[in-house]
């Protein structure tokens, strides 16, 4: 089953950046159909940086505890093994303009992760020191296990990824936001089977995944690992982690996110429920 699914999904891509060639650097650092985020919003958003000619943004993440960041496994494993080459930048309106990069002491990738399309696309980063929580930087609330995030619920995804297919976020690289509707898993799975070689009996969208977006609004490359948040009873809850998709805002190809509620026990094995 694993090999069949891998062979059947050759064009489905995770939403992280590869390292840019020299001279392309600042062009390699969006959200489709969105707008610049207000400075007062999304205080849990972080940028993951890898060392090169400069500390380059390659994925997003969210602060879920003063000392812990939640991100996608395909962003940091198994390729990123050198902690010295990884940094975390807390909420920043424009990439690279006021960097205060934080070192990471530990990377924990879910043990069942193989590829984003197979699932378990979730990872934790432990910061060397807890951060000072403020109105500008603070944690996002994880949902209770019972929260389902019903189809049609309006949620928001944020990041610094591409603004369209193969269209990079231009300077000054602002944090972008877009509202996306939740889509029921079985409908999302049926859409991904359209035009695919995968048999109908092979599930593409699995129980640990969550779908959101449409042909006008979606996350895109470079947004990987960032949060999908939904407001429930006045509280922002992190429903998903940007994981993968086929293109960005393409017909019948919603964005696919790691479902946070599916991994709450695993998260809390490492991360205290209260700071």
From Swiss-Prot:
InterPro entries: Peptidase_S1_PA, Peptidase_S1_PA_chymotrypsin, Peptidase_S1A, Trypsin_dom, TRYPSIN_HIS, TRYPSIN_SER. The active site is at 74 (charge relay system), 121 (charge relay system), 224 (charge relay system). GO terms for cellular component: extracellular region; extracellular space. Residues 19-30 form a propeptide. PROSITE patterns: TRYPSIN_DOM, TRYPSIN_HIS, TRYPSIN_SER. The keyword Secreted applies. It catalyses: Preferential cleavage: Arg-|-Xaa, Lys-|-Xaa, but with more restricted specificity than trypsin. Changing residue 52 to D: In allele alpha. Its EC number is 3.4.21.59. Changing residue 53 to R: In allele alpha. Its main location: secreted. Changing residue 133 to I: In allele alpha. Disulfide bonds join 59-75, 155-230, 188-211, 220-248. Isoform 1 and isoform 2 are expressed in lung, stomach, spleen, heart and skin; in these tissues, isoform 1 is predominant. Isoform 2 is expressed in aorta, spleen, and breast tumor, with highest levels in the endothelial cells of some blood vessels surrounding the aorta, as well as those surrounding the tumor and low levels, if any, in mast cells (at protein level). SMART domains: Tryp_SPc. It comes from the Eukaryota. Changing residue 29 to A: In allele alpha. Changing residue 3 to S: In allele alpha. Pfam families: Trypsin (PF00089). Tryptase is the major neutral protease present in mast cells and is secreted upon the coupled activation-degranulation response of this cell type. May play a role in innate immunity. Isoform 2 cleaves large substrates, such as fibronectin, more efficiently than isoform 1, but seems less efficient toward small substrates. Belongs to the peptidase S1 family. Tryptase subfamily. It is linked to Hereditary alpha tryptasemia is caused by an increase in the copy number (usually between two and three copies) of the alpha allele. Affected individuals have elevated basal serum tryptase levels that are associated with cutaneous flushing and pruritus, dysautonomia, functional gastrointestinal symptoms, chronic pain, and connective tissue abnormalities. It is not clear if the associated multisystem complaints might be due to the coinheritance of a second functional genetic variant. This is Tryptase alpha/beta-1. It comes from Homo sapiens (Human). The lineage of its organism: Eukaryota, Metazoa, Chordata, Craniata, Vertebrata. The gene is TPSAB1.
């Amino acid at each position: 089953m694993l090999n069949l699914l891998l062979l059947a999904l050759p064009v489905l891509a995770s939403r992280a950046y590869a390292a840019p060639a020299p001279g392309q650097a600042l062009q390699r650092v969006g959200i489709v159909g969105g707008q610049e985020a207000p400075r007062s919003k999304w205080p849990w958003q972080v940028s993951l940086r890898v060392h090169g000619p400069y500390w380059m943004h390659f994925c997003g993440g969210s602060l879920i505890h003063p000392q812990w960041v939640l991100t996608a496994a395909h962003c940091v494993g198994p390729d990123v093994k050198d902690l010295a080459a990884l940094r975390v930048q807390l909420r920043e309106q424009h990439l690279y303009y006021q960097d205060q990069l934080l070192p990471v002491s530990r990377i924990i990738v879910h043990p069942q992760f193989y590829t984003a399309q197979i699932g378990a696309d979730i990872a934790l980063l432990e910061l060397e020191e807890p951060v000072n929580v403020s109105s500008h930087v603070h944690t996002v609330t994880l949902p209770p296990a019972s929260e389902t995030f019903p189809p049609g619920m309006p949620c928001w995804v944020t990041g610094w990824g591409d603004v369209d297919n193969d269209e990079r976020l231009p300077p000054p690289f602002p944090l972008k936001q877009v509202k996306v509707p939740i889509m029921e898993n079985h409908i999302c799975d049926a859409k991904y089977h359209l035009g695919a070689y995968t048999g109908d009996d092979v599930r593409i969208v699995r129980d640990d995944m969550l779908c959101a977006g449409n042909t006008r609004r979606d996350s895109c490359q470079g947004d990987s690992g960032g949060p999908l948040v939904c407001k429930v009873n006045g509280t922002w809850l992190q429903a998903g982690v940007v994981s993968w998709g086929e293109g960005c805002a393409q017909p019948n190809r919603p964005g696919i996110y790691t479902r946070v509620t599916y991994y709450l026990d695993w998260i809390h094995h490492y991360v205290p429920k209260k700071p």
